[in-house]
Amino acid sequence: SGCALRTDVRRSTVMRRLAWDAPEVNEEWNCDKGRFAFPYTSEGRLTHPLVRDSDGNLVPTSWPEAIRIAAAGLAATGSATGVLTGGRVTVEDAKAYSVFAREVLGTNDVDFRARAVSDEETAFLANHVASKPLDVTYGDLETAKSVLLVAFEPEDESPIVFLRLRKAALKGNTKVYAIAPYTSAGLAKMKGTLLTAGPREEVAAITNAAAHLTSDSVILVGERAGQTPGALFAVAELAQKTGARLAWVPRRAGDRGALDSGLLPIGGRSTSEILAAAGKCVKGLLIGGVSPEDLEGDLVAAVESATFVVSLETRHTEVTANADVVFP
């Protein structure tokens, strides 16, 4: 999910962010998050490549020198390198990371998920989402007979989806159901129906939701479902049983593009496994735009343990503070 935006710049200064001319996506409207929630224009951005000198300090250097040092270090770690990209890179960058990791470094230890992950989620994404057509559009949400929300809060996680569902519900076109422990403010605004499910009750609630779905329905499942054992498999089975269309809605804008570009660790280690193996089986780390806050203390500990670390970032973090080479 996401919206089409344009950024107006004058004299190297961002003046405003407006909805792009793509009415089929966001009807020429963009949410407050899209308009204001971006930090890349704030002060403190990195402007030059940095390398660690003989005294252990990060110092500015030229691009050719930084590339030379990074290439030598990654060549040394080779297939024992883990690649973590985060979910905010473009499709083109995601593809470049994937090809570089698998064909140049010779590693399958790649993952775009900057959060807690599970084997069930990996299998679900590989079998039911990756390389599948995007057959659920924003317009489809307004014409669906019913929409089931599983581990997904549209108002908080995807305001454009919320706007469409609220619009459809107020017109009486679509009935919204949500599997959750309580009725959220967003669900109330969509005149939705709560299918109550407390801890360890989600899988049963998903199975029982079949009574509210038909082939004209849509199931929207959020990334939080991956933290409930059995939930994603139950969702896939529900979609197959009812004929409802299924859409996975992650929180980060680049997650789906990264998934389709090959940044799921098929045959390799997941994010949590890469971090746990840092300094052991995983000697090197290539990290692109993953914030320490996303993975609490695990990421910093892994960076400190690794033999060689390359970081691509917009500004200094605890990752860049411990990296051997930093690219802005």
Segments from the language model and where they lie:
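Catalytic alpha/large subunits of respiratory electron-transfer oxidoreductases
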Residues: S1-P328
